[in-house]
Structure formats: structure tokens, C-alpha cells
Amino acid sequence: MAVTDSLSRAATVLATVLLLSFGSVAASHIEDQAEQFFRSGHTNNWAVLVCTSRFWFNYRHVANTLSVYRSVKRLGIPDSHIVLMLADDMACNPRNPKPATVFSHKNMELNVYGDDVEVDYRSYEVTVENFLRVLTGRIPPSTPRSKRLLSDDRSNILIYMTGHGGNGFLKFQDSEEITNIELADAFEQMWQKRRYNELLFIIDTCQGASMYERFYSPNIMALASSQVGEDSLSHQPDPAIGVHLMDRYTFYVLEFLEEINPASQTNMNDLFQVCPKSLCVSTPGHRTDLFQRDPKNVLITDFFGSVRKVEITTETIKLQQDSEIMESSYKEDQMDEKLMEPLKYAEQLPVAQIIHQKPKLKDWHPPGGFILGLWALIIMVFFKTYGIKHMKFIF
């Protein structure tokens, strides 16, 4: 008996220790998540996605932008928080072998245009002026809400740009340019006007690193597809379409983002490594000296995903409803079920039967008095004009 009692006590003590340790681990995990949430310091995410190139041979730049658009939507950023600027409509281009589609993978495996793409600025609207107005908020009052960047000092903003560029500039539709100085000043205006909390700038263009050299505003992290003096190369030529489908840097970034889910703990340091020189041929670059947080503590979803607000409470919430509320909800459910019944259409003949169906014979009715009188008048006029002697020449 003594041995049994001692064993039971030991088992009880061991179970208590295990429960306490498990509870402490779970509590520490919850505390870490809460600390991460409050440390991020933002309450909403925005994305400004810009393709600055037009013409069919720049198909890949439109596909780049639409691929990023698809990823941020998949991770939870709604269209109301995305400003999409496309300088050309490749989906409706006469050279497109499959209209209303834009593919980002060879053999036409992935259509990134889809059925729910909301383009906010297109064609001639994609200009340097409109881009800077979107960033700084200097927009005419008549501008619709979908074309505005309605961010605040608690907003994390992703700005993605792709096109043709050089040392210190990015071309817009081969007609104008935005310089790295103009871009840096626009970001400073955004900071002074409290239009962002943190900003992630990504650019895929030749000599892309030159575009973030002049940045001087706080809380900006920047990534580029190539260093100064290097070209950003294309990827995946498609013989059916006749052009390259994407650029190398964006292609590998999108492959990386496809593995991310809204609850992922992947950080920005992982994003820095997605496209080494062996894959991109060019040398991707990044700048973090203006950013206050350590990149390893910055989640990918802090910019590419939606903000999921979590509130920890100790209050007890009653889930049981009163009888009257239960009865009314039951009646509403019954009404909803009746309304949700599928509609039944009248039975119709198949198209083939309709085409080959014989026409219905009409019933014969004797002619009316008006018809008989008309024929009598015609005969009288004939005999008066020609007479009986001309009948032999007629018949």
C-alpha cells in the first residue's frame, strides 16, 4: 500500500509539473505573438503597384506588376487598399493570342489577369505627375476613392515599380522620367504629412539600386533587382506569345511569396536571399540603414499581407441566447432556407429539336367578302381594258 501511494503521489507531481511547463510554454508563445503585434506598430497595409512601360515587347513588365498584385490580394490586402497602375493593356492587345489573359509562367500555366483585376490608373493616366500625386495625397477633390492612397501614420506601405531605367531614373512610357531625387523628396513629403508608418520600396529595373541612393526619410526599407552599372534581365521566353513573360528578379520573388501564408513567420532577411547572382545574373541590392527595426524582426506579412487585429481579453462572453432570440433566429433561418431554394425554369425543347421541328399546318378558312370583292374588281377592269377578243393572246 505504501509503495502504491508513493507511486500515485509521484505520478501526480509529475503530471502537475508537465501541465505547468506546458502552460508556461503556451503563455510565452501568446506573449510573443502579442509583443510582435504591438512592436510592428501599424494598423493597416497599403500597396502601390506601378508598371511604367507600354508596347507589346514590354509584356513582362505588366506581368511583373500583376503577379505582385495577385500575391498581395491572396495574402489579404483588399482592392480598396491597392492602387494598381498599368501603362498598357496587354490583355486586350491585338497581338495577344489569348485575349483577356496575361501569363506569368511558360506554357500559359498561370493567368495573372483573372476576372477580378481592378486597374486604377491605365494607359495615358500612368504619368510621373499622377504617381507623385498619389504618394503625396495632392489629388483633385473629384478624384474617386479607388484612385487615392488613403494611408495614415499607422500604415505600412508597399511600393513596387517595374520598367526601363538607368542610373538615377526610371522611364514612364518612353516619354518622361522620374529621378531618384524626385522619388526621395516625395517620400519625405509622405513622412512629413504622416502618410506612412513604415515603407517598403521594391524596384525591378536596370541599375535599380540607384533609385534608393538618395532616400533620406526614416522607416524606409528598399530592395532593387540590380546594382549601378548592371542590367536587370528578363526570364521565360514563350514562343506562342513571342516575348519574355517576366523579369528574373520578380519571378523568384513571386516564387518565394507563393510559399507564404497569412500566419507565416518568414522575415525580411529571407526575402533578401531569394534571388542570388547565380539565378538573377544581376546583383540584387537592399538598403536598411533608414529602417528602425531589425529586418529579422520584420515579417513578410507586415507589408505583403493584411493586418489581423488580435485583442486579448479576460472577460467571460456568454454564448447562450434567450429563448425569444432563439425562436426569432429559427424563423429567420426558415425564411432564408425558403429564399435559397433553387428557381425552376419551364421545360424547353433542345435546340436541335427546335431546328428540325416541322412547321404546323394552318387550318383553311374561306376568304372574306373584302377579298372576293377585290378580285371581282380586278376581273372587271381587265375585261373592260382588253375585252374577250384579246383573251387568246393572253392564254
Curated annotation (Swiss-Prot):
The known regulators of its activity are described as: In the absence of proproteins substrates, exists in an inactive state with a disrupted catalytic site by an autoinhibitory loop. The binding of proprotein substrates, particularly the CSP region, to GPI-T triggers concerted conformational changes that alleviate the inhibition by the autoinhibitory loop. Meanwhile, proprotein residues near the omega- site induce the formation of a catalytic cleft for catalysis, following which the products are released and GPI-T reverts to the inactive state.
* Effect on the protein of changing residue 61 to A: Decreased function in GPI-anchor attachment to protein
Q: How does it sit in the membrane?
A: Single-pass type I membrane protein
Q: Where is the active site?
A: 164 (proton donor), 206 (nucleophile)
Q: What's the name of its gene?
A: PIGK
Instruction: Give a short account of what the protein does.
Output: Catalytic subunit of the glycosylphosphatidylinositol-anchor (GPI-anchor) transamidase (GPI-T) complex that catalyzes the formation of the linkage between a proprotein and a GPI-anchor and participates in GPI anchored protein biosynthesis. Recognizes diverse proproteins at a C-terminal signal peptide (CSP) region that lacks consensus sequence and replaces it with a GPI-anchor via a transamidation reaction. Transamidation catalysis reaction follows a two-phase mechanism.
Q: Where does Ca(2+) bind?
A: 79, 82, 118, 120
Lumenal side of the membrane: what ranges? 28-368
Identification of the protein by name:
GPI-anchor transamidase
UniProt's post-translational modification comment states: The disulfide bond between PIGK/GPI8 and PIGT is important for normal enzyme activity.
Q: Relate the assembly described in the record.
A: Heteropentamer. Part of the GPI-anchor transamidase complex, consisting of PIGK, PIGT, PIGS, PIGU and GAA1. Interacts with GPAA1. Interacts with PIGT; this interaction, via a disulfide link, stabilizes the expression of GAA1 and PIGK and links them to PIGS.
**Protein family according to the UniProt entry:** Belongs to the peptidase C13 family.
Start and end residues of each stretch annotated as Autoinhibitory loop: 231-236
Where is the signal peptide, in residue numbers?
A: 1-27
What outcome is documented for mutating residue 302 to A in this protein? Answer: No effect on function in GPI-anchor attachment to protein
Effect of mutating residue 206 to A: Loss of function in GPI-anchor attachment to protein. Abolishes GPI-anchor transamidase activity
The intrachain disulfides are: 275-280
